[in-house]
Amino acid sequence: MSDETVSRSQFSLKTYAVRVFALPVSWYYSLSQIKFSPVAKKLFMVTAVSAVSVIFLAHHFKRRRGKQKGKVLPWEPEHLLLEHTRRAASEKGSSCSSSRQNLTLSLSSTKEKGSQCCNYPNGGLLSRYSGSAQSLGSVQSVNSCHSCACGNSNSWDKADDDDIRLVNIPVTTPENLYLMGMELFEEALRRWEQALTFRSRQAEDEACSSVKLGAGDAIAEESVDDIISSEFIHKLEALLQRAYRLQEEFEATLGGSDPNSIANDTDKDTDMSLRETMDELGLPDAMNMDSADLFASATELAEQREAQQTFSLESFCPCPFYEEAMHLVEEGKIYSRVLRTEMLECLGDSDFLAKLHCIRQAFQLILAEADNRSFLAESGRKILSALIVKARKNPKKFQDVFDEMINFLEQTDHWDSTELELAARGVKNLNFYDVVLDFILMDSFEDLENPPTSIQSVVNNRWLNSSFKESAVASSCWSVLKQKRQQMKISDGFFAHFYAICEHVSPVLAWGFLGPRNSLYDLCCFFKNQVLFFLKDIFDFEKVRYSSIDTLAEDLTHLLIRRTELLVTCLGADALRHATTCTSGHSHAVPTALLEAKVQ
């Protein structure tokens, strides 16, 4: 390169620098004096090339990012709808697989029947697909575009658009609507249960002074005391009971217990039943209606059915016996010594009291028959005698005092004093549940769960042998009974005979629960569990019927027989044989009038 060429290049560079950076003239002349070394020139060239490369890459990535904006992002409504569809389909179990199969088959069939599907722009495939996942996909199509399903018959030939157009097909079948409705109904049940259990959480968090209730876009703030009121709790419990029965009725009527039976029904029958329903109610064909017409028709359908009272709430609540008891609870006329709401898995205290009132009356009806009274007395004798035999004791003395108790209850002269004795202990209703199940059995189990520290120290002492521990436990039980005898106001009353029975039974049960893990412990635990299971069963709508006193008494009798047979079977043939040989005389019946006392 000649000197002239170098000078020209330097001149042009200086001129460019002056024009770009608007340098002063003085700077321009000073630049002419600057000379760059070869290393500086190389660094300048590398920097310039790098800057150009960075600018080019930034522009390239910016274009790619602009193209990706057209794709569905994870947080956009379309993607969320598909994710919700997958979750709903996975929860359906076997119906999920059938829904996917229907989607796959429909994808292949739409190519062959492209012209046919376009006959109904807004619902041409109304009965072609089933499953909750497809019905959720139809919601997207209704909200976005009604003509995207079959807007152009030639679009079905494009492989890239098949999946998208398939999801947008409005698949509004009766089965899908039923499944979606049941999902929303179950969600409502969960919300109501949370509202009912809010009262228990209120005690744990007393700092909360208000609660927000969401209703659409409006949010109302009300105090906890106004919402969690007694009247509100009663109404919510009654609503939940009606909702449970309504759910069971729908499942029994429409085959809700087997989701596959709904999802796999033939499309022809579904179409026919839907058209017949529309024709009977005088509504236009749903196949040729848009979303607005469908909404209006659904409103008319609901109004007509409500007017006809075909699906009224009362028709799904065949429990007038329970409803009457609930009204008495709201008026404060039902009393219970102990509220066992959580133990018996009731919805609330009102639910427990209402069921308790029904159970009391049912037991009155059961004990009105002599056969039932004899059965209960004989069953109690066998079970307790077998427990004593398992503890290697002679049940003869126990059976004698047991017979004395039965003879005492048969004498009408002692009924008034017995009622006073029990009322002083909080038992105001002379009933099989209140006296036997609650006061005697459940209180005994609770006392054995929390024994005195003196008994615990003896039982947990490793240096003492089992026989000494058993004797110490028996002595502790007898000392407690002796103290209770001293507090009795009537020396020969109900509690005198009851404590006489406890002298033989309490040491056996105490050693059975607190002693070593042997056959006696297993039998005592089984006896306790059967009592608890029986109580839970009679307080469960799924196990007994609260429609009337007769049906409830019938179910209680069946449960009594079932639990007693299980206990007798578990006792073993040897224990029963020994107990039978020691039995003196025939069994005595429980007095009728005492156990048939009216519930106040």
From Swiss-Prot:
GO terms for biological process: mitochondrial fusion. One of its GO terms (molecular function) is protein heterodimerization activity. One of its GO terms (cellular component) is plasma membrane. It is found in: Mitochondrion outer membrane. Keywords: Membrane, Mitochondrion, Mitochondrion outer membrane, Phosphoprotein, Transmembrane, Transmembrane helix. The chain crosses the membrane at residues 15-32, 38-58. InterPro entries: Miga. It comes from the Eukaryota. Disruption phenotype: Mitochondrial fragmentation: mitochondria become round and show loss of cristae. Female mice show decreased quality of oocytes. Mice lacking both Miga1 and Miga2 show strongly reduced quality of oocytes and are subfertile. This is Mitoguardin 1.
